């Protein structure tokens, strides 16, 4: 386990071979939120029990016996934009077992829609590169324009816009140490105002043509 990464990623069991997508895809969330508001959140030595936070979030979401909560709609809407249809439990498991999910900020926010500081976004870049170097995704889909605007600008190359229904969506790529490229785009954050059928068309273009 990498000690620098506080919120360890969720890694689907079929991710290595691309699962149902046939491509290695990483979903990049922005942050967890936690009501504890520990002053030393993010310190792996003091809060090892929190390092599986992301895993527990996905486990709860994928457990159909867990009571449904409002935050789960974010994952529901996004997963539909990956396959272009309403999803049932069987499809849900296939989708998330095919991807890596990682939250960018390595400290928890106090509540939903809360932003990190400029310093927190900058500091998280090191862990982000550590994760993509380890898991070698071919594609990264980031949640939200705020996160997109705060991603590292090193080892970066701008890509061509994807235009669907007249709206341009920016793309780019990171260069890994082995010479591979990781192609990146961002969707609107699926927690609010998210049209999964529109974003399905954008994502399909991204995965097929970028």
In which residue ranges do the predicted regions lie?
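A polyanion-binding, active-site-adjacent surface
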Residues: 1-135, 139, 145-147
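C-terminal capping/extension of enzyme domains
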Residues: 115-126, 149-210
């Amino acid at each position: 386990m990498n000690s620098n990464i506080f919120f360890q990623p969720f890694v689907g069991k079929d991710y290595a071979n691309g699962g149902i997508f046939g491509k290695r895809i990483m979903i990049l969330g922005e942050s967890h939120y936690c009501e504890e508001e520990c002053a030393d959140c993010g310190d792996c030595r003091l809060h090892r029990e929190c390092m599986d936070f992301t895993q527990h979030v996905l486990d709860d979401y994928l457990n159909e016996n867990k009571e449904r909560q409002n935050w789960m709609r974010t994952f529901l809407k996004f997963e539909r934009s990956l396959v272009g249809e309403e999803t049932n439990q069987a499809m849900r498991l296939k989708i998330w077992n095919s991807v890596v999910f990682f939250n960018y900020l390595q400290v928890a926010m106090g509540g939903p829609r809360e932003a990190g500081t400029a310093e927190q976004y900058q500091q998280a870049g090191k862990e982000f590169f550590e994760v993509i170097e380890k898991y070698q995704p071919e594609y990264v889909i980031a949640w939200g324009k705020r996160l997109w605007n705060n991603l590292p600008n090193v080892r970066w190359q701008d890509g061509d816009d994807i235009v669907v229904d007249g709206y341009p969506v920016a793309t780019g790529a990171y260069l890994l140490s082995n010479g591979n490229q990781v192609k990146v785009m961002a969707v609107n954050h699926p927690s609010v105002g998210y049209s999964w059928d529109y974003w399905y068309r954008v994502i399909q273009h991204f995965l097929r043509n970028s």
